[in-house]
């Protein structure tokens, strides 16, 4: 009986993380397909596939902000991002639910790409950006916001998880070619979105 309960609990945990699992699968599939069709370390190839490159993105190819979120330059790049996505994504998805979690992830990633574009345009740097790290930093911001402002414990974020989120963020950002502007943009977006979600839900509960 106890083993059955454990297995059922494990299945429930995975079902509660279905969006995180889907995002990981999507990133891995994109990586495999692009690796088979060309050289993912080649910036020109990655631009052709949809990487974020500000001269093109800010000229109207805004779809690159989305496609670049699922592209990676190496297996190490993919692996470090997916480990962090699983670790932090499960926390945020359990707290916010599938819809709000996906909204937080996507808006953080899009914001990260946009901030990266404007920053590199200002400094006139021809940087090709790709990867899930901007969105993942958004999850770090979300965890921080919920840990700080959810005083009633409505979303069940354990404040002891914040250092772990910071640690995974550091692991994501240790690569020499890290896009700091994107990470800052994603972090700020995730923090703000979760803060707004918390405030709206708290306000609605108070009015009722």
Where are the predicted features?
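A detector for small-residue-rich transmembrane helices and their helix-helix packing motifs
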Residues: 2-208
């Amino acid at each position: 009986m106890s083993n059955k309960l454990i297995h059922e609990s494990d299945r429930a945990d995975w079902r509660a993380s279905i969006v995180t699992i889907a995002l990981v699968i999507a990133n891995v599939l994109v990586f495999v397909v692009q690796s088979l069709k060309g050289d993912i370390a080649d910036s020109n190839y990655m631009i052709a596939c949809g990487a974020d490159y500000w001269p093109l993105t800010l000229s109207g190819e805004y779809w690159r902000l989305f496609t670049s979120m699922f592209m990676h330059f190496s297996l190490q790049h993919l692996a470090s991002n997916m480990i962090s996505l699983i670790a932090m994504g499960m926390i945020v998805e359990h707290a916010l639910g599938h819809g709000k979690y996906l909204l937080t992830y996507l808006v953080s990633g899009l914001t990260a790409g946009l901030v990266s574009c404007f920053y590199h345009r200002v400094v006139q740097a021809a940087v090709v950006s790709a990867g899930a790290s901007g969105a993942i930093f958004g999850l770090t911001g979300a965890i921080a916001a919920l840990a700080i402002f959810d005083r009633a414990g409505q979303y069940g974020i354990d404040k002891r998880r914040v250092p772990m989120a910071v640690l995974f963020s550091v692991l994501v950002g240790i690569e020499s070619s890290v896009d700091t502007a994107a990470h800052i943009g994603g972090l700020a977006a995730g923090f703000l979105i979760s803060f707004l979600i918390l405030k709206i839900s708290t306000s609605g509960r108070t009015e009722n």
